[in-house]
């Protein structure tokens, strides 16, 4: 199976953990969209669930498929969240945020009893960091914040190019919360736990794309089917 087939296989396997009456968090990105589309087919066939999307993009897709939607203000407790990952390691530590929705994804995931990660085999790595780490920052004073990010990263053994994300027109990319994202190409992150905590102590940093101690399970698509990794 190619990578997209592996994503689909993982998404379909995740449906096994969805039960009638559940309140679900729905992730953002190409892998999560496979799950949302598969979930839409189940809803069309009569499955009774309600979903909380992690982005405007996911909300539009889910609505187009007839999936009933709610929000965390009205539904503050969720049963599971199913989302993709840009990278994951054997301890179920993740890098997320390639789709620009890391803050909402983390809020929704931590409002859930369980987070289930779905991914193709290429996303499973020994050491996080090959995928650039997204860090969400407020626009005010962002250049100062970026310098602080570089200093903190260096103190945790991470160096590399940092760049403010741009949209397809070359203009600054804004998240759904109207913040910037700096993508940090560290190559390797030797201490994900320490780096994540240190980054979030920087004034101006809203959050970062390291998900530590959040995922309960990963379903990884492979050439032969799917593998499950549990925390």
Curated annotation (Swiss-Prot):
InterPro entries per UniProt: NagB/RpiA_transferase-like, Ribose-5P_isomerase, Ribose5P_isomerase_typA_subgr, Ribose5P_isomerase_type_A
- Pathway named in the protein's UniProt entry: Carbohydrate degradation; pentose phosphate pathway; D-ribose 5-phosphate from D-ribulose 5-phosphate (non-oxidative stage): step 1/1
| BP-aspect Gene Ontology terms | pentose-phosphate shunt, non-oxidative branch
Q: Which reaction does it catalyse?
A: aldehydo-D-ribose 5-phosphate = D-ribulose 5-phosphate
The record's listing under SUPFAM superfamilies reads: D-ribose-5-phosphate isomerase (RpiA), lid domain, NagB/RpiA/CoA transferase-like
The molecular function terms of the Gene Ontology recorded here are:
ribose-5-phosphate isomerase activity
Q: Which UniProt keywords apply?
A: Isomerase
- What EC number(s) does this enzyme carry? 5.3.1.6
Tell whether Glycosyltransferase is among the UniProt keywords.
Answer: no
Q: Where is the active site?
A: 105 (proton acceptor)
Residues annotated to bind substrate = 28-31, 83-86, 96-99, 123
Assembly mode: Homodimer.
This chain's function reads: Catalyzes the reversible conversion of ribose-5-phosphate to ribulose 5-phosphate.
| HAMAP family, per database record | Rib_5P_isom_A (MF_00170)
Q: Which family does it belong to?
A: Belongs to the ribose 5-phosphate isomerase family.
Name of the molecule in the record: Ribose-5-phosphate isomerase A
Q: In the record, what lineage is assigned to the organism producing the protein?
A: Bacteria, Pseudomonadati, Pseudomonadota, Alphaproteobacteria, Hyphomicrobiales
């Amino acid at each position: 199976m190619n990578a997209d087939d592996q994503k689909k296989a993982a998404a379909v396997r995740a449906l096994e953990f969805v039960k009638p009456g559940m309140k679900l968090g729905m992730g953002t990105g190409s892998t999560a969209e496979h799950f949302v589309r598969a979930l839409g087919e189940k809803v069309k066939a009569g499955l009774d669930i309600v979903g909380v999307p992690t982005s405007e993009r996911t909300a539009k897709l889910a609505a187009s498929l007839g999936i009933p939607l709610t929000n965390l203000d009205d539904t503050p407790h969720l049963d599971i969240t199913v989302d993709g990952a840009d990278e994951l390691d054997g301890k179920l530590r993740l890098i997320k945020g390639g789709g620009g929705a890391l803050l909402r994804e983390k809020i929704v995931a931590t409002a859930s009893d369980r987070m289930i990660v779905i991914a193709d085999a290429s996303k499973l790595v020994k050491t996080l960091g090959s995928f650039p780490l997204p860090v969400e920052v407020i626009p005010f004073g962002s250049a100062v914040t970026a310098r602080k990010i570089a200093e903190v990263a260096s103190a945790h053994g991470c160096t590399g190019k940092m760049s403010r994300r741009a949209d397809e027109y070359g203009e600054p990319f804004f998240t759904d919360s109207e913040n910037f994202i700096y993508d940090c190409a560290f190559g390797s992150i030797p201490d994900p736990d320490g780096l994540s905590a240190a980054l979030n102590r920087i004034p101006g940093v809203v959050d970062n794309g390291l998900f530590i101690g959040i995922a309960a399970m990963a379903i990884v698509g492979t050439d032969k089917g799917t593998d499950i990794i549990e925390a």
